[in-house]
Regions:
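Helix-loop-helix hairpins and the membrane-proximal interhelical loops
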Residues: 1-60, 133, 191-298, 383, ...
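N-terminal alpha-helical transmembrane segments of multi-pass membrane transport
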Residues: 1-62, 103-112, 117, 121-132, ...
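Transmembrane alpha-helix interface/packing and boundary motifs in multi-pass membrane proteins
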Residues: 27-41, 71-83, 158-163, 259-269, ...
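Short helix-coil transition sites and intra-membrane helix breaks within transmembrane domains
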Residues: 33-42, 80-91, 123-127, 265-274, ...
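Re-entrant/interfacial helical elements at transmembrane boundaries that shape
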Residues: 41-51, 64, 79-99, 130, ...
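Membrane-interface alpha-helices at helix entry/exit sites of multi-pass transporters
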Residues: 58-62, 99-116, 288-302, 322-325, ...
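A structural-propensity feature for long, helix-poor, extended segments
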Residues: 68-80, 86, 298-323, 327, ...
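Membrane-embedded alpha-helical modules
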Residues: 111-227, 340-468
Length: 469
């Protein structure tokens, strides 16, 4: 009965006009952003964080989440039509999506990716509905030592499973933890790592850090590697989007396997949608009777990875909401957004603020339905967005970032922080240092320190409490 009452309350919140508007705006913007190679959901969410300060918390989180999973839908469009992934998670879709487009089946490829994305996302929303409350019920009894262990596991997993060197991942986590300790020690009042800057007394801004590392860095890197001209793309009509009965039959099993793989990867910290899509593609190729056909434009090659990456995106909310442990960089920014709005993520969110939790889940259902309705009839309109000159788009985004970060505290120092971390972010991209573990370390580092201090206070300095509890 409690489940039904929470379900009804959440549906009522999600169906409020303001929240419907925020949900629609989020998924529509996410779709557009996903189509534009090099921008991505992470930088967009980072840029829009200042805007959400003036919004009601539930609506703000609904909109930001809509951008995240909406970008997965849009990312496949660029992969199929231009052989350029709109987001990293859609990279594997290029392998068979673009050959399908060259074979005259671009419409079928786009239609199929939209349908399987909806199925994969819906599957993970069901998991979120049932698993997150169960995990939260267990985690509500956690004390400081258990929280320390869970946070430490999340940091280590994120660093070791990140793309590239494990050593680089661990190094970035360490740097993130150190950056998270900047400012006054809350227990002693002693300033730490301020280097004489009074503006750093309250610590570094999560918005400035995220905007610099993921917004400015990506824009600068893309400006360095493109000429700013718009892409040449095929036109797509509504009639060409419908797959045949044989296409649906062929794609059914790969879609089921893909959404299961994606949901599992989303729950595990550090894996995420990119690994899920590649793993599902590799699985289908291994199980296929004709593996040599992969890469030539077959429906299985797009159905499995698209179902996987959308399932992964939705299931990534399970550890973030129920434990307060983000699995990737986007979830870390979402965690920061919750904190900015005074919402403590973790088991208390699920058990003590069920209206927010269930309202968010119900908005996922509505958002997925919006995406299905948007991406099928309006795909021809969305494709035209790819013809926007990139140099003008990027310059406008840089101005928006600076105005946004300044508006938070009316402090010019934050703009310098954004610029500094933007340059650092470009250097990290060139050196292949993953930025996501750094952001995770920045967010979770203070939580790790606080729970370690509490545990040692209870045990009177005995470190064995972390082993025996």
């Amino acid at each position: 009965m409690n489940f039904l009452s929470d379900f009804q309350a959440g549906l009522g919140i999600a169906l409020q006009f303001d929240n419907l508007l925020y949900c629609f705006a989020g998924v529509a913007l996410g779709t557009v952003i996903g189509m534009l190679p090099g921008i991505g959901a992470l930088s967009t969410i980072s840029m829009l964080l200042p805007l959400t300060f003036y919004m009601e918390p539930t609506g703000a989180i609904i909109m930001l989440a809509g951008i995240f999973y909406g970008a997965q839908y849009g990312g496949s469009t660029a992969s199929i039509l231009m052989n350029i992934p709109g987001t990293a998670t859609n990279a594997v879709t290029c392998l068979d999506g673009y050959p399908m487009a060259k074979n005259g089946r671009a419409g079928v490829a786009l239609g199929m990716t939209t349908i399987v994305s909806f199925i994969g996302g819906s599957f993970s929303i069901l998991l979120l509905m049932f698993l997150a409350p169960l995990i939260a019920d267990v985690a509500i009894s956690f004390q400081a030592p258990e929280y320390f262990a869970v946070i430490l596991f999340g940091l280590v997993a994120a660093s070791t499973m990140a793309s590239g060197s494990v050593v680089k991942g661990l190094a970035m986590v360490t740097v993130g933890i150190v950056l998270g300790l900047v400012g006054l020690d809350l227990n002693t009042g002693v300033p730490r790592f301020q280097f004489g800057f009074v503006e750093m007394s309250d610590g570094l801004s999560i918005v400035a850090l995220a905007m610099g590392l993921f917004g400015v860095a990506e824009i600068l890197y893309n400006l360095m590697n493109t000429d700013g001209s718009p892409f040449k793309v095929q036109d797509v009509t509504m009639r060409s989007l419908m797959p045949t009965r044989q296409d649906v039959k062929t794609a059914t099993a790969p879609t089921i396997r893909g959404m299961i793989i994606g949901a599992a990867c989303g729950i595990l910290p550090g894996t995420g949608a990119t690994i899920a899509s590649f793993l599902s593609y590799a699985t289908e190729k291994r199980l296929s009777r004709h593996p040599e056909k992969f890469g030539t434009g077959i429906i299985e090659g797009i159905a499995a990875p698209e179902a996987a990456n959308n399932a992964s995106v939705q299931s990534a909310f399970i550890p973030t909401l129920s434990l307060g442990i983000p699995g990737d960089a986007v979830m870390a920014v979402m965690l920061g957004a919750l904190m900015i709005h005074g919402i403590a993520p973790g088991p208390a969110l699920v058990t003590q603020q069920p209206e927010l939790f269930w309202g968010l889940i119900m908005s996922f259902w509505i958002g997925n339905l919006f995406l299905l309705l948007l991406n099928l009839p309006l795909i021809g309109l969305f494709v035209r967005i790819l013809k926007i000159p990139y140099d003008a788009l990027y310059i406008a985004m840089l101005v928006f970032i600076c105005l946004g970060v300044y508006s938070i505290r009316n402090n010019v120092f934050d703009i310098f922080v954004v610029v500094f971390f933007g340059i650092v972010g470009v250097a990290m991209i060139l050196g292949r240092y993953p930025a996501a573990p750094l952001l995770l370390g920045f967010l979770l580092g203070p939580m790790l320190e606080e729970n370690m201090r509490r545990a040692l206070l209870v045990s009177r300095g005995d470190f064995s409490i972390f082993v025996h509890g």
